[in-house]
């Protein structure tokens, strides 16, 4: 029987498969599903739009573009997600408004060691270009790139993930903000917003807690 553990609930296990938001005993390719169900309610996977989801656990960053489905009901972290045959394929992890991610083997992904480096997430505004850690109109960015080209590159200190309606990018910069590396994903996506976790405190008491988008790193 497949088991899934939410990182937001302390379920990270380095001995299991790890995907954004979950550790699991199986590695499900969630790109193949067009319909999923939660508590016997069916939901269609959104076409040509994705959610960039990520966990930060034990100084490890696990990020990926994941499929998502629309649901007007409130679904809680850890709720089981099944395929049309009734097999559990994932659990609820991240959401953006009325959209919920389907975590597992997704599309483009990023797995990093965060020892000595930071990572930052941004919404890429429509019409803007990117250089390193800044976004602006194309002409401004072109001048910025020209200016920074005179500097010698240094070690990477920060990664920046840019999520836009039509394209997503990852850049890496040195201490001066010079761009050292760039990746482009030709897919439009959204960033998740914090979900709510209902935690049982006592025999008859519950409290709603706002979870972080990903599990807090170990200290």
UniProtKB/Swiss-Prot annotation:
It is an enzyme of class 3 (hydrolase). Transmembrane segments: none annotated. InterPro entries: Poxin_vir. Its EC number is 3.1.-.-. It catalyses: 2',3'-cGAMP + H2O = Gp(2'-5')Ap(3') + H(+). It holds the Pfam family Baculo_p26. It comes from the Viruses. Induction: Expressed in the early phase of the viral replicative cycle. The keyword Cytoplasm does not apply. Belongs to the poxin family. The substrate binding site is formed by the N-terminus of a monomer and the C-terminus of the opposite monomer. Homodimer. Nuclease that is responsible for viral evasion of host cGAS-STING innate immunity. Cleaves 2',3'-cGAMP which is produced by host cGAS following recognition of cytosolic DNA and blocks the subsequent 2',3'-cGAMP-mediated activation of TMEM173/STING, which normally spreads to adjacent cells and activates the interferon and NF-kappa-B immune responses. This is Poxin. It comes from Vaccinia virus (strain Ankara). The lineage of its organism: Viruses, Varidnaviria, Bamfordvirae, Nucleocytoviricota, Pokkesviricetes.
